[in-house]
Amino acid sequence: MKVLIVESEFLHQDTWVGNAVERLADALSQQNVTVIKSTSFDDGFAILSSNEAIDCLMFSYQMEHPDEHQNVRQLIGKLHERQQNVPVFLLGDREKALAAMDRDLLELVDEFAWILEDTADFIAGRAVAAMTRYRQQLLPPLFSALMKYSDIHEYSWAAPGHQGGVGFTKTPAGRFYHDYYGENLFRTDMGIERTSLGSLLDHTGAFGESEKYAARVFGADRSWSVVVGTSGSNRTIMQACMTDNDVVVVDRNCHKSIEQGLMLTGAKPVYMVPSRNRYGIIGPIYPQEMQPETLQKKISESPLTKDKAGQKPSYCVVTNCTYDGVCYNAKEAQDLLEKTSDRLHFDEAWYGYARFNPIYADHYAMRGEPGDHNGPTVFATHSTHKLLNALSQASYIHVREGRGAINFSRFNQAYMMHATTSPLYAICASNDVAVSMMDGNSGLSLTQEVIDEAVDFRQAMARLYKEFTADGSWFFKPWNKEVVTDPQTGKTYDFADAPTKLLTTVQDCWVMHPGESWHGFKDIPDNWSMLDPIKVSILAPGMGEDGELEETGVPAALVTAWLGRHGIVPTRTTDFQIMFLFSMGVTRGKWGTLVNTLCSFKRHYDANTPLAQVMPELVEQYPDTYANMGIHDLGDTMFAWLKENNPGARLNEAYSGLPVAEVTPREAYNAIVDNNVELVSIENLPGRIAANSVIPYPPGIPMLLSGENFGDKNSPQVSYLRSLQSWDHHFPGFEHETEGTEIIDGIYHVMCVKA
């Protein structure tokens, strides 16, 4: 246990009260309580701001000075941002303290200890009792139960075979593995025979209580804890919602797990096509694509569904937000899509934090309270491990029940099909803890901190861009509004100079309005989408607002390679866009290093520093290509290639339309199982049917889905693969990753259904 004692700067240490505080600190130490002492408000505030976990906050204040009242309020406020139920003690003279405090302040203090009347041992005992009660309610249901069960130190005769880690200690490699991860991981790795903990698959005991807790915090009627990632969550929902007789509506900007769900179920898809801007940034599906008339027309015209014209789709899925951080007004989208289907699925794998900050109001699935829901059944899937705080593979399915609801027993059959009978309890517990971290005040505090850091970074980049361009030079600029308006005053500001509080709390600063050039989404409806502040893209120079390449530019691939050499890994790179995810683990020092590294790139780029000095590994590996080049020379060569070939335009064309679907994804997959497939080189792809999806990274979205036809030799799909092949040949070391292709002797091949 740990106590923070904050003493007033107005209290002299050598007074009788000061000596009494010293005796209390000694008494606490004798009860194995760690005592941290602070002798000023600033020091105490700094300790709490550093996320120091404490079990009790004590003030040695007489409350006679006006500043003491304000200090106490601020310190308790800071404490409660992340540690809401920590007991607060006021140590003081009874008559003076009570007489000086108002009602609001009295309500913030849990206990008053009269330091001159009660003994130090008595006050210490009261504090230990309060801290014990606090700790008993601190941990969420499953994690608490696991810790208690681990303390039993049982002799187990069941799986897993390592028996609490003992098995690993019997060889040197196993011992090293055991010591590296620590004993608690292995002690809590238990089989499903521990009935006192309940069951993940039956949702009983501590597992069931954990899911009820998650449902309350995330605003669902029911939540399902998943340990096979959101890929498993998505497949589970699809397996529960559809069969091979169903028509379903799918966002073309979908994760590959959605296609896998189509393979498993055999359902017949029609697709909603999202928008893209000049940079290849993924925008929203426009409302006209979601209109019931539009979707029924697609059903009647698609080769896969035309025999089911007029049939009501059993399911509809939308990716929210897009990978680039474009968030739908989910309320508006739901109002449209519920006219088509009674089951809506928002794949919010990268967006599980939205409920906890008002800046995202109306732009996520689990809006408001479950009891107020009246409409279709709504699913949301969250990767708690992505931008919350959980171990990899941790995920949640959240459900608001309405029309088309699937009862527990039926849904659980699909859940068990995709779960495991041997879950790693550490993943389950991390899901539980991720929920508890978002409960109460801490959810707002944690999300606000991330938004604050992201906005600070954006403004720092905007100021540098402004300064460099004023000097006739170049720099990277953040992809966001260049001018914002305070809706209360009507005053406008350059983004770089806008009040931070305006940018971090007012949603309109991030809403995409029609006619704004910065976002580049033509004809976007008002109040349809907003940019997520924490998904930060920076733009390298080289592309004009009309989408045409300028005379000179800096290819983003070269910048990303520079960053990688300095230990910085962006989440996504296109021709002129580099994207960074701000999360709860990002610090000011981390993004400060990023800014410095970008400035370093500019300095060396402008100086045309030889590649042998700044990227020696590249020169060593490919001396024939790069030996005599400077970094600016390479950038110019890359830019000239981009200007001539413009692969981004080919990719935008590929994503703006739909290839002909010859067979369903399931039928294409069956061809793989039957070995009725062959690898086909790029020049022979025209007219062939893809057996697997082709997914360029970035953006990680299917350009072609299983069962679709490549089209003729000039189709955007074939043209784009041809341009990638050319890029890889010209710039070894900068190859693109394209899932679903195989490169043989420098030639792209794709697995196709045999003709």
From Swiss-Prot:
Up-regulation conditions: Under conditions of acidic pH, anaerobiosis and rich medium. Forms an operon with downstream adiY but not (further) downstream adiC.
Presence of the UniProt keyword Lyase in the record: yes
Transmembrane segment boundaries: none
Cofactor: pyridoxal 5'-phosphate
Gene3D superfamilies: 3.40.50.2300, Aspartate Aminotransferase, domain 1, Orn/Lys/Arg decarboxylase, C-terminal domain, Type I PLP-dependent aspartate aminotransferase-like (Major domain)
Residue list for modification N6-(pyridoxal phosphate)lysine: 386
The protein's name: Biodegradative arginine decarboxylase
Keywords: Cytoplasm, Decarboxylase, Lyase, Pyridoxal phosphate
